[in-house]
Amino acid sequence: IFIGDEAVMVVDTQATPAMAQDVIRRIREVTPLPIKYVLLSHYHAVRVLGASAYFKEGAEQIIASRDTYDLIVERGEQDKASEIGRFPRLFRNVESVPPGLTWPTMTFDGTMSVWLGKKLEVKIAQVGRGHTKGDTIAYLEDQKICFAGDLVEYQSTAYAGDCYFRDWPTTLDRLAGFGF
């Protein structure tokens, strides 16, 4: 979560709107600023199915790389059914997920920036294929803070069902080159 002087950005939405509401409540403990932006680090259901909760909260944009958007078009419904079926423990209050999909409203190729007011620029980049072909990072360059989605896992084995084994090491090298 990035909190600027005028707005908030959430990276990944949680697996269900009910779970997203928990995040929204926690954000409200810290700031009353509007949650204007949601960034999807990739297309997997556990990261995107909570998106509708942010629209209800007033989010203006759901941002995804063009490759992530294309994967949602190609596999979104299938991934939704598959992940809910295979990993029900990850989808608390699954009944809160609305029918269909909540779509990104803004896509990008390569890089983009979002200003959360006058003081905080969040840089967004698709650094290469790894966990999926649409992997996206968000970072604060000067502070050396990075959200890398599932490109980087901590004390966990990465899910590799959609990965690009040959590309992933190069993508991680590129990510390491940012100096985070």
Regions found by a protein language model. Give the residues of each.
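Loop/turn elements at helix/coil->beta-strand transitions in domains of secreted/extracellular proteins
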Residues: E6-A7, L33-K36, G58-E60, K119-V122, ...
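Conserved beta-strand hairpin/beta-sheet module of binuclear metal-dependent hydrolase folds
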Residues: I1-R26, T136-D150
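Cap/insert and terminal regions of metallo-dependent hydrolase folds
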Residues: Q14, A18-A20, Q155-F180
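Active-site neighborhood of phospho(di)ester-bond hydrolases with catalytic His/Asp-centered motifs
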Residues: V11-T13, K36-H44, I63-R66, V127, ...
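Core dinuclear metal-dependent hydrolase active-site scaffold
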Residues: T107-E141
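Solvent-exposed loop/turn segments at secondary-structure junctions
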Residues: V8, A15-A18, Y43-V48, T68-L71, ...
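PEST-like low-complexity, intrinsically disordered acidic/proline/serine-rich tracts
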Residues: D70-L71, I124, A158
